[in-house]
């Protein structure tokens, strides 16, 4: 398995694959490493934004996985011209070659898709091991599918999409969304709640913005958690009943928390904790508690 640090190195990779197709596996890996080093040198600092992981096993097709580093958002083009915006800590994978009867990708996390129209080759976004699929021909939509959660959401901006859900006993449910509709799915039960939404709030993250309108605080904290790559600990359960309004652009986490402190009478404490891994990396924990008395 090799990594190429890059924001959008797909074209370079495809050319490289053609040149090396007739070489042995060992020689291919050596040449691939050299090409990766060249790409890194050209792209420079943008290599910190995301990377591609190319993996394969004996008898199986190659898969390319594109990942956005924690705390950073990025975008890239797929081979068919579809534009994908990938949120912090998210990943997208697809098989190579990318020329089958359908254009299928797998998402973990959050992404916004501007799908190139092709009636003969449907575009499918899959999550949770094919238990959730969004099928389109050409459209724009936002999708959240975090592995740590039991809900998946799809918000349609333009065009139309078909949502297919397979519950835990294998029963399949299907829905069609219209523009400005958001489908929130319980992946275990296969139940979907469809509501009308302002898509600006659902897609603001693409521009580095956070927008909340009368949103329950637990949902606000989820957004902040993914956006800033932090974890939250609520010490006073009453905080879960709070609602929050606000718009933030290019703000540090502490600035958002300060606003939360003033508007919702919440105290916070930021702690750095060592993660349980071999690299000794740190994670950020934010402890929230209700203000007492006249504080």
Where are the regions that the model predicts?
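Alpha-helix initiation/capping motif
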Residues: 2-9, 67, 210-213, 246-249
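N-terminal export/assembly leaders
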Residues: 193-295
């Amino acid at each position: 398995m090799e990594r190429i640090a890059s924001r959008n190195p797909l074209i370079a990779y495809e050319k490289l694959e053609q040149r090396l197709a007739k070489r042995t596996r060992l020689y291919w890996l050596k040449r691939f490493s050299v090409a990766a080093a060249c790409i890194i040198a050209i792209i420079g600092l943008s290599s910190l934004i995301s990377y591609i992981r190319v993996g394969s096993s004996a008898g199986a097709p190659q898969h390319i996985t594109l990942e956005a580093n924690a705390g950073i958002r990025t975008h890239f083009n797929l081979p068919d011209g579809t534009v994908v915006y990938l949120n912090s800590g998210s990943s997208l994978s697809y098989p190579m070659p990318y020329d089958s009867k359908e254009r299928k990708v797998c998402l973990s996390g959050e992404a916004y898709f501007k799908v190139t129209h092709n009636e003969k080759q449907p575009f499918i976004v899959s999550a949770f091991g094919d238990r959730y699929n969004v099928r389109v021909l050409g459209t724009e939509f936002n999708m959240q599918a975090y592995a740590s959660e039991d809900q998946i959401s799809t918000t349609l901006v333009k065009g139309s999409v078909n949502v297919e859900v397979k519950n835990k006993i294998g029963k399949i449910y299907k829905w069609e969304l219209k523009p400005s509709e958001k489908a929130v799915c319980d992946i275990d039960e296969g139940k979907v709640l469809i509501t009308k939404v302002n898509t600006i709030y659902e897609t603001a993250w693409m521009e580095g913005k956070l927008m909340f309108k009368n949103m329950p605080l637990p949902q606000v904290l989820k957004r902040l958690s993914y956006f800033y790559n932090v974890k939250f600990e609520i010490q006073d359960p009453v905080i879960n009943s709070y609602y929050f309004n606000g718009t933030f652009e290019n703000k540090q986490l502490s600035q958002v928390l300060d606003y939360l402190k003033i508007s919702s009478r919440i105290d916070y404490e930021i702690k750095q904790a060592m993660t349980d891994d071999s690299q000794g990396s740190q994670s950020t924990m934010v402890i929230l508690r209700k203000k007492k008395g006249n504080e």
